[in-house]
From Swiss-Prot:
It comes from Dicentrarchus labrax. GO terms for molecular function: glutathione transferase activity. Keywords: Cytoplasm, Transferase. Glutathione binds at residues 21-22. The N-terminus is blocked. This is Glutathione S-transferase 8.2. It comes from the Eukaryota. Conjugation of reduced glutathione to a wide number of exogenous and endogenous hydrophobic electrophiles.
Length: 32
């Protein structure tokens, strides 16, 4: 059970990173 929670945490972190990156890209393009 503990490993599932760990996997979900990693997946959430990965999702957050992708969200931050895409947002940064959108921001960069919008400010050009």
């Amino acid at each position: 059970m503990e490993s599932i929670r760990w996997l979900l945490t990693v997946a959430q972190f990965d999702f957050d990173m992708k969200l931050v990156q895409s947002x940064a890209i959108v921001n960069y393009v919008a400010n050009k």
